[in-house]
Amino acid sequence: MALVLYGASSVFPVYVAVLLAILARILLTGALHEDGFADFCDGFGGGTSRERILAIMKDSHIGMYGVLGLVLYFLLLSQVLVAFTPAVAACLVWTGDVWSKCCSAQLINFLPYARKEEEAKAKVVYERMPIPAIAGVALNGLVALALLYVLTGNFLAAALAPLVVTGLMIRYLRKKIQGYTGDCCGALFLLSEFSFYLTALCMQ
């Protein structure tokens, strides 16, 4: 996404480069995180009980809350990234991706899986990461932050935002469904990443 944004900005206006970068990630990941975010919005927007929330998130059809969530997310994301120069935006996108995955990955270490294994949409139940894996993920995130500071001399404090969002999400999920699902992981990554960019914008 960062490479597409920076490369496309030399040919197209910044807002077009940002949209192409977002499209590139969607094509590369198969909209995995966005699909999870839409299901998350549908489930927690329309569900009033643990069972209902989980049932809605398991439904493959997107609802009103999912559509509204995605539209608002893409509008806000594109507007925030356009506010930076292409070089700075590319640095932030690369760092935000790595650091936000580092933070959001901790969800599986703090909460149990909310469904029974046979009910999981992808038939996969995430296991808690061993200590070496946690250390490796943390190292990747810290290296990304260090490179961001070397290249821009700014924005380190923005790293706090994904940590706060992750903590709040863990607390919210523990209260609402007593665990997490794959959709929650995807939603948390996008929300953590956006909080990083938004905080960086406030620091610019």
Give, region by region, the residue ranges found by the protein language model:
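Hydrophobic alpha-helical transmembrane segments
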Residues: 1-30, 44-52, 59-204
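Histidine-centered active-site/metal-ligand motif
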Residues: 33
